[in-house]
Regions:
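N-terminal non-catalytic structural scaffold regions of very large proteins
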Residues: 1-279, 283-285, 330-336, 340, ...
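Intein-associated homing endonuclease modules of the LAGLIDADG/DOD-type, together
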Residues: 7, 501, 510-512, 517-523, ...
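Conserved NTP-handling cores and scaffolds of large molecular machines
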Residues: 9, 48, 52, 66, ...
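A generic structural motif
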Residues: 165, 532-537, 737, 741
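Long, charge-dense accessory insertions within large macromolecular proteins
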Residues: 192-195, 199-322, 326-670, 674-675
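Conserved phosphate-binding elements of NTP-dependent enzyme cores
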Residues: 647-742
Length: 742
């Protein structure tokens, strides 16, 4: 029935007292349908029997600080009224009195007469009608006076709009559209000037249609261009301050050296990088948020705004955080549906798993078989995974294991931007040259990532040699803690992040509340390395003795060095007296950990010549290591010399003072109280490390015990599917090897 009524864009909106349908067309004219015939009822004023001449006229406003100023006044001030009328094609004429005006016009009284303006030009009407807010003042002004800026100060005075607001209007006209916004507006075929946008915005008020507030097609996901936004905003602020103060022409544009930096660090969306694992590395670039500079207030984002919108499909994945920021912070899919580099969303045409699910879910076999709420926990668990020596490439794969390295930063993988060849390889770095002549490099060997206040040691390796050629997108170096060369394609790098175990699914005291038990053998397989950094601050004049060496194995009670205070030999003490005094004055910091000394760095504020000989020797050795690593990876060569901006635990390093950082790497096998992840997302706490052996009926050793109830209660099938598939693949592999050897 509606299809028959709603022809030529009209819409049904009610019925008469006789039950006759009423429709409204695109021109806001109402019709009743009588026996298939459309009978005009007029506009809304006619239907409601209201005098349209006396009815208020709609007009658009623009907010400047705390005041709302009609768009017509702003446009008139910036362009002149005649130009505004011409641009909007507004028809107007002079009349003797209001009675001569039809319902299609409204009037404004000026000093030189009464002028009628056409209401049927809806955009022009909304702009010009704003002048009615100043009708008392306009009676003393001629129409042509509004072509001059000075006249508008009289209008502004009526509404107590001071020069501060006027200058803001002028600056907004100059600075509102930045270069990035201009390019986007051009792509959208929209106006690229402030005045043009005011007119376009008024035009969009012509109807009541508007996109949903959560419609992603009406938004942009901005990346590092936000940094340019901070810079532009601070520059604009400085220019505004300059123009507001520049009364006598002697002021200067003043931008503080830390203004931009302070604006960035005050942004509430800022987060420290966590170099803990390659998936977390991806997540930090896939994360999107509604808060931050230019964003929304988290407290104002209610349930409706946190729901998943249809337009999110193909851009925003299932992954979000498990806190009060749920859906305020979310993660993009592994291949979001962007139409350009500015983060604009297009129409989704091809639906595939990488385009819908997050990187975490794409790495989780059978995750689509799990309860939807539990799939999100794959992403959550991936933020806390650390490297273990027993990791291997998964037997059951999704295929995304090959993509991770190509998306990672240099801490985890170094991928070729173009084809080229290797220039040099040392134990501390690799340098390559692309076909376009550009050189790049990455540090090899031990590097340290930071996450949540801890240091995590990573080992960057390469299989390439000097003068070897490579292809575009080939992984040139990778983190061996998380990646290995693929056995099928030696040029491909596959992610390794799993350890397969024979798990007995049973209920016992060890599986209460999702806990688990593991064998001693399996515990030793899961050895994780962490690095403890000992910081020692000393003065240049102090001597150091018996300093530990790089590569040395130390115990918790071993001394890292002996520091002698400045008791100076110029006092003429004999050798025995000096030894007594030195023994009283010396400091000897302890290691506090059992591990291996992997690196010693010295950062100093001052000149090497001012140091004691022992400290200078240590600093020179540190500088040599730092410089060699930088040179070997095509980086600018630096040393440990710093200034007073360098801080040790938040305190600036004083002049003629040095910080010695000793990196001690510790091995930690999985033990009671440690957390593990069963299958994709089943977090468990180790309740017992079994020093006895449990076997299956056919004699196979059990590596771990976990509760089947824990799996069943969470409606996840992936643990069962992964376990059975991996077991089957191992049997098939053994059969294949047996056939090959026979």
């Amino acid at each position: 029935q509606l299809k028959k009524l709603e022809i030529k864009g009209s819409r049904a909106c009610g019925i008469t007292t006789l039950g006759e349908p009423i429709v409204i067309n695109k021109d806001n004219e109402f019709y009743k349908v009588v026996n298939g015939q459309y009978v005009s009822l007029g506009d809304i004023y006619s239907v409601l029997e209201i005098d349209s001449i006396k009815a208020p006229i709609d007009f658009s406003e623009f907010r400047v600080f705390d005041k709302y100023i009609p768009v017509g006044v702003i446009l008139g001030y910036l362009l002149g009224l005649n130009n505004v009328l011409k641009v909007l094609n507004v028809k107007y004429f002079k009349v003797e009195n209001k009675e001569d005006v039809t319902k299609d016009h409204f009037t404004i009284k000026f000093k030189d007469g009464l002028y009628a303006f056409d209401k049927r030009n809806t955009v022009g009407s909304k702009v010009i009608a704003g002048l009615l807010e100043y009708e008392k003042t306009l009676k003393n002004l001629n129409l042509q006076d509004l072509n001059h800026k000075d006249t508008y100060y009289i209008l502004f005075e009526e509404k107590k709009i001071t020069s501060v607001y006027v200058k803001e209007i002028e600056l907004t006209n100059e600075l509102f559209v930045d270069p990035i916004t201009e390019s986007i507006l051009k792509g959208m075929n929209e106006p690229t000037t402030f005045t043009g946008l005011l007119i376009r915005a008024t035009e969009m008020l012509d109807d009541y249609g508007y996109p949903d507030s959560q419609d992603l097609t009406q938004m942009r996901i901005r990346g590092y261009e936000r940094i340019a936004g901070f810079i532009y905003k601070e520059l604009a602020r400085s220019i505004k301050t300059f123009k507001n103060k520049n009364i006598n022409g002697r002021s200067k544009v003043d931008l503080g050296p830390y203004d931009i930096w302070n604006a960035i660090i005050k942004d509430n969306s800022i987060k420290l990088v966590e170099d803990i694992n390659p998936v977390q590395d991806l997540k930090e670039r896939d994360v999107v948020t509604y808060v931050g500079e230019g964003g929304r207030d988290k407290g104002a984002i209610q349930k409706e705004a946190r729901s998943f919108h249809d337009s999110d499909f193909g851009v925003i994945s299932e992954a979000t955080v498990d806190s009060s920021d749920v859906a305020v912070n979310a993660y993009m899919s592994a291949n979001p549906n962007f139409v350009n580099l500015r983060g604009m969303v297009g129409k989704l045409e091809n639906v595939n798993t990488p385009g819908v699910l997050s990187a975490s879910a794409n790495l989780a076999p059978f995750s689509v078989m799990d309860d939807g709420k539990r799939v999100n926990f794959v992403n959550i668990m991936n933020s806390h995974i650390v490297a273990a020596e027993g990791y291997e490439a998964p037997i059951v794969r999704t295929g995304y294991e090959y993509m991770v390295a190509k998306r990672n930063t240099d801490m985890f993988a170094f991928t070729a931007e173009d084809a080229g060849k290797v220039i040099s390889v040392t134990n501390k770095g690799i340098i390559v040259e692309y076909n376009n002549g550009k050189r790049a490099g990455v540090e090899l060997g031990r590097v340290y990532g930071r996450a949540e206040g801890s240091y995590y040691p990573h080992m960057i390796v390469t299989h390439l040699k000097a003068n070897e050629v490579f292809k575009k997108d080939q992984v040139l170096a990778y983190n061996s803690n998380f990646f290995e060369r693929d056995i099928y394609d030696p040029t491909a790098i596959v992610m390794k992040s799993v350890v397969y175990a024979r798990v007995a699914l049973m209920e016992s005291n060890n599986t209460f509340e999702d806990s688990s038990a593991i064998s001693k053998k399996f515990s030793n397989k899961l050895v994780a390395k962490t690095t403890k950094v000992k910081s020692v601050v000393i003065k240049f004049a102090q001597n150091i003795h018996n300093t530990v060496n790089v590569g040395q194995s130390i115990g918790a009670n071993d001394k890292l060095m002996i520091i002698e205070d400045e008791i100076t030999s110029s006092y003429g003490f004999d050798k025995k007296a000096l030894e007594i005094l030195q023994g009283l004055a010396q400091q000897a910091p302890s290691a506090e950990y059992n591990g291996i000394v992997e690196n010693i760095e010295v950062y100093y504020h001052g000149e090497l010549d001012d140091m004691s000989s022992s400290l200078r020797e240590l600093a020179l050795a540190s500088d040599k290591r730092i410089s060699f690593a930088r040179k070997s990876s095509n980086k600018n060569i630096i040393t440990g010399k710093v200034n007073d901006e360098y801080r040790v635990e938040g305190v600036p390093l004083g002049l003629d003072t040095a910080e010695i950082k000793i990196y001690i790497t510790v091995d930690n096998s999985m033990s009671v109280g440690d957390k593990n992840i069963v299958a994709n997302q089943m977090k468990s706490v180790v309740g017992e490390v079994m020093d006895y052996t449990i076997r299956t009926e056919n004699g196979d050793e059990i590596d771990a015990i976990f509760g089947f109830r824990s799996i069943y209660a969470r409606i996840v099938l992936s643990p069962i599917l992964i376990g059975t598939s991996a077991s089957l693949m191992k049997v098939i592999a053994k059969k294949a090897v047996s056939i090959f050897r026979s």
